[in-house]
Structures are given as structure tokens and as C-alpha cells.
């Protein structure tokens, strides 16, 4: 009995240390979540003019989604900033395949089949690329979404290509995607950056 009593203070100290570690880990996890939310909201605030100067380094990971005719459309991308740079014909070269984001290929996932420019696209996950031009852009849906930038891009893996004319838009500092509903079965994937906008129409089957 005396031996057990002797060790009790040490047991209490160890238990207290473990409890403190758990609390610290919980705080750390909560802080990480807070940072993620802040980075996402930051881009929206910059685009709305609520933050005068974009000082965030890097290209935060963002997402866009909508449900069209019970078809969940989900886009994952990274969002670079203008930051006073020349974008078109500068940072983004004309007439070359562009990741239309940063770091990894932008991915678009459809939970149901869709039709794009007369081509049926099976439900699945795909890479979204563009080829910007001075007068027109080519929008591309490609099978290989697991690649860095366009390092492994292969035109033979394209499912569909659509030529569109970009339209002028109010300044958007951080590249942003939207899935805009047109009617019950039709929608468009919209890309805004700097003062240009391009859109890829599709129909949910």
C-alpha cells in the first residue's frame, strides 16, 4: 500500500502532461481549419475590392460546384493573383496549353453524363485546360487530371475541344471558377481572371 501511494504523484503528473498535449493538438487542428477558411475567403474579399492590395503569396486551393438536373458538378483548382502583372501574352502565353490555374491540373468532376458541343462525356473526373489566344480561346476537357501543370498533357487524351470568344469583364484579381445554371438541364463552367471571362456550356443528360 505504501509503494502505491509513493507512485501516485508521478501518475498524476503524466496524466496532466497527456491532457495538455491533447488540448494543444486540438488548438493546432482548429487553427489549421481557420487558416484554410481564411485563405479561401481572402480571394473572394480581394475580388470584391474589400482588400485593397493582394499580398497573399502563392495560389490558394479553391473549389466551385453546383447541381444541375441532379448532376453534381465539382471543380478543384488553384487561384493565382494578378498582382499588377501582365497576364495575357505575359504570364499566360498565347497559343499554348494552359493549366488555367496553378500547380496541379484543374479538375472537373461530373456525377452524371453530360453533353458538350455535341459530344457525350461520361460521368467522371477530368482535367480542364485552355489555349488562350488574342481573338479566341480553345477550351479542353482531357482524361488526365492527375498531372503537374501541363507536364504530361497529351492531345490524344482530349475528350472534347470547344472554341469560344472571350468576353470583357470587370477586374477579377484572383482567378475564379463558377458553375452557372442556365436552365433545368443546362449550365456553363465560367472562368474569370483579370478582365476576361470564358465559358464552357454543357447539358446534363
Where are these regions (language model features)?
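Mid-length scaffold segments of soluble, non-membrane domains
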Residues: 93-147
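Short, solvent-exposed coil/turn segments
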Residues: 10, 59-61, 103, 109, ...
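Sec-dependent signal peptide recognition
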Residues: 3-10
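C-terminal motif of bacterial Sec signal peptides marking the signal peptidase cleavage site
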Residues: 14-16
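Primarily secretory-pathway and cell-envelope proteins
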Residues: 20-91, 96, 150-205
